[in-house]
Amino acid sequence: MVKSVANEDKTTITSTSKTATSLPSAQPLGATSVPNLIPNRLAVIGKGMRNNNALLANVLQADIQRWYPWSKLQHRFNSNFKKPHAFIGWGHKKSYQRAKKAANRQNIATLSIEDGFLRSIDSGISSRYGLSVVVDDIGIYFDLWRSSRLEELIIKRVEQSSSTDRLILDKQRAQQLMARICTERLSKYNAVIDCPSLDDLIDAGKNDKIAAAKQIDRKSPKSHVLLIDQVVGDASIKGAGADKRQFKRMLKAACQAHPDAHIWIKAHPAAKAGYLTRLTLPENVRILTQALNPIALLAQVNDVYTVSSHMGFEALMLGKAVHCFGVNWYSGWGLSDDSGAPKRLLKTVKKRRQVSAASLETLFYSAYIDYSRYVDPATKQACTIDSAINWLVTNRYWQTCLAGDLTVYEFSRWKLPFVKAFIDLPRTTLFIKPKPRLKNLLHLDHFRVNYQQPLLVWGLAKRQQVQKKLSGKLSKQSSAIPTIFCMEDGFIRSNGLGATLLAPLSVVIDQQGIYYNATQPSDLETLLYNCKTLSAQQITRVQALQTKLLTQRVSKYNVGNRISSNSYDNSDTLKSTGNQPISWVEAAKKSGKLRLLIVGQVEDDLSVQYCGAHIQTNSSLIERVRQDNPDAYLIYKPHPDVEAGLRAGKVTERYLKSVQAIAYNTAMPDCLAGVDEVHTISSLTGFEALLRDLKVVCYGLPFYAGWGLTVDIDAQLLPKSKYLQRRKRKTPLTFEQLLHATLIDYPLYRLPNGYGLAQVEQVIDYLYPGHDERSAEQADDTAKAMPAKASKPSALSTVSVLSAQLKRRATTQFMQKRHQWQQRLRKTSR
């Protein structure tokens, strides 16, 4: 058992502190990196910071070395020892104080590091993979007794608040990001996505002392007021000029200001001692002790009272009235009620700032973009806030969907490593049920399968087999059939065929059915049917993705030769009347006829058998297309697995005479570039053709058909007409919606050596590094089950390259032989 989404312009840091120094720039790590404004050599005292933050060096884009008391001597006697440019410490804790002392002795700067405002899914104790940090060379944002880099950034933005185009764009961007953060319910920690209804809690009488004693009318319309409790000893409380007396004042003020309201105290979810929870509370005050989503909770209240919690700023983003009883980084700018804040500190802060007002967008942009730094755990590279949000949304969704016990049911042994890489999530406990071979039958765990817990199977055939088995087994026990998740290859799979045992970088997991089975609904069909109008950000992302797909020539398997204007493939040429052969692309163009590409498929594949088509063989497809288009120029493209001799679907010479050309070894993007229409039963090539705005004629019902984007042949015949009824939307589906649901929402992506699930754009960048020749390192990493430390392609030896090629060739030959024996056995059984 295995337990278990453009670069931002950063405001340049110019220190005003006596102890801080101007920080040199370092080169960004790549196209997705943000400009680095801190030194590239840092030192830390102790091991806690690096151990608790696995991606600290990645987000800071710096080399972090541990500093020992004798490290200064190393610099004297070891010429290879590089002196750090700055020391780093955590907040104002001991690590920072020790780092500051060491930095003063070395006469270099000290930087304070803290968790960012969008930190991770789980709490800091449970997750070492934080997505964001803040770096401060002046102070730290929660200590208002002195200035901080965040305060300086806000002041600078306010002073530059003239109507420049750049600031207008920044304001719009801040509004878009705030809207998305609130819509996705993102906070510092994001393990919980929902919050119980406060009205329902009152109706149920939970934590309701008044109802128990007086039986009052719980359904009376009253407002909700939230008081945010904090952990005793929290450094931000002292930094806000507050103590336990401020919490008492806050409670008293809230009760006096809202005598008829429902007052709630948000306690710390980890059951740590708080200031409010240990007080004697009035009868109309209730405590929320359960883990819940902060944004979902704040959305239900009218007023929020806080001392120094960041939830106060999140309440401002939601348009709530915020009453501060401490001096926060977001208070004193005219956005909050600061009448209860410590007067002396508030006066000092306002005098220091010399700015009386700042907009919400200015505060957000300064804090979340200028001040914060982000890293994507999937790529382990510095990134923008958009990428961090995409990672949080994707990984939280799948961690929630697959939480609990899950049985991986009878997978091939070679698939298990990459299956674990996709679904071995923090809140998922996997049980591996092997195939029923003799050695597995002898294993004690083989018969310990709990058939009442969710199962994960590979492909439609295994799903049907398990459903049939469980219907008989559980009917005797009067138990419902458990959830059966169906896993399959994704739409952007790998640089090679799945039949050669090459691990995928993308899979789909479907709870209802599977995308290629038109006989019943699937999760993808449901996504497409319920797809709402895309936001401006989503449309921008989809358009950029479409451009990337076309520019990088992306296809599912990414196999075949690219056609060059100076060369041709002998296997994809036509005999001409002259002495020189010509390529089929050139011949088709010169013919002046309508060019139709017929896409071959694996005939015994379930995507053909369950697509509702009357035509289910490649030969019949060629015959039908020729019959309906007698004057067209036909090009037939065999399926890669059939072409490699691994699967059934070979077309005889009799039917091949009906076509003018056969694209044996031409890459699919080149095939699509040379035709006018695509004719297919249910191939994914039809979707790739829609990307290129080509006319697509479907003889079956693939996932992209039936929405008004394709020509659906035999739509009036059963059973296809029956299946089409499920796809009748009130509003037409746009191609942007189709692309977003199919490539962004539906699949799961991963990268070798990465943590968590990746995004489609990242997988494309990995598979297409910018040159035609793929490095052997990538092919090897993709095929590996367990993550290994990546090395540069240039460092690979010739022996390693040849070894990888021989391994793939041997695997292909083995699969070809196996397919031949399977065909012989089928003929014998007949």
Segment roles from a protein language model:
Residues M1-E8, I13, K18, L23-R830:
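Catalytic-core helical/loop segments in enzymes performing group transfer/polymerization on anionic/lipid-linked
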